[in-house]
């Protein structure tokens, strides 16, 4: 295997509750699927390259607090990915791509931060492809492309519902109907729409979106659109082009989302207090 001509794919996503109708492994299953598809597409488009598919890593942060959700601290996820990326780089691999099915802001930034760290320190290309893509998807950027691939285009009301589909709803239920139909509860068809709104009260049903709208056809259409985007980023990267605009999300520079923000904030406060105490002692000494 020529490591200069090998793309490594890391599927990384947590185990998390997605409502009463879906399995705990929704994000993890999605990550495995997209990593496999990305690897397959890479060797098709670039027969001069090999693809190495790393075992799935069922770890993530900032999860909904539901039975079965398993999270770690942001620093743990960050350190783990930095460690794996560094090890792969030391073994000579130059191209590493993370695929994730989890779209929480802190998770995205932790993965991106780890990739930036390894890329700069080891002079390789390591990218989280899914983060920026997830944000664009949630903003509704791909709705028209998906609609055009369906046997019956989406109506305006359906497009509006899709823009509010965040967790365990239309898209994720559709993906499980495609990937793991035996793990989808029949009751999804009778679940009411649940819109995520700030300040809303009441019992959380475990999902935000419209699971009753789900279909395997919708999943297939969305997969085609997303894989095209993933393939484009990988192709650019393997061709030596800068893909940071495609792989660094708009939320990357938000300090409060950084994986070790609280630790650094506390250290900063302690250093400030220590400095003030020293200045006070110096002042007291000088005025004597």
Put a short name on every predicted segment.
Residues 1-97, 101-288:
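Extended, histidine- and acidic-residue-enriched regions that form the cofactor-binding/catalytic faces
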């Amino acid at each position: 295997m020529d490591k200069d001509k090998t793309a490594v794919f890391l599927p990384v996503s947590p185990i998390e509750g997605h409502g009463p109708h879906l399995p705990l492994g929704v994000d993890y299953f999605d990550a495995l699927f997209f990593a496999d598809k990305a690897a397959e597409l890479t060797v098709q488009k670039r027969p001069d390259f090999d693809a190495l598919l790393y075992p799935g890593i069922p770890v993530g942060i900032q999860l909904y607090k539901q039975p079965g959700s398993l999270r770690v601290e942001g620093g743990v996820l960050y350190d783990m990915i930095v460690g794996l990326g560094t090890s792969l780089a030391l073994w000579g691999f130059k191209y590493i791509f993370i695929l994730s099915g989890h779209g929480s802001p802190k998770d995205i930034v932790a993965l991106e931060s780890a990739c930036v760290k390894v890329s700069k320190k080891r002079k390789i290309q390591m990218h989280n492809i899914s983060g920026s893509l997830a944000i664009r998807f949630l903003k509704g950027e791909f709705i028209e492309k998906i609609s055009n691939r369906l046997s019956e285009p989406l109506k305006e009301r359906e497009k509006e519902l899709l823009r509010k589909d965040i967790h365990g709803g239309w898209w994720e239920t559709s993906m499980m109907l495609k990937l793991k139909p035996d793990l989808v509860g029949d009751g999804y068809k009778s679940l009411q729409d649940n819109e995520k709104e700030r300040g809303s009260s009441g019992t959380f049903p475990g999902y935000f979106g419209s699971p009753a709208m789900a279909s395997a056809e919708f999943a297939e259409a969305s997969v085609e659109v997303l894989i095209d985007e993933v393939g484009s980023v990988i192709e650019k990267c393997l061709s030596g082009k800068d893909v940071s605009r495609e792989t660094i999300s708009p939320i990357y520079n938000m300090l409060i989302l950084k994986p070790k923000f609280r630790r650094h904030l506390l250290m900063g406060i302690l250093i400030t207090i220590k400095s003030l105490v020293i200045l006070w002692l110096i002042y007291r000494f000088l005025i004597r």
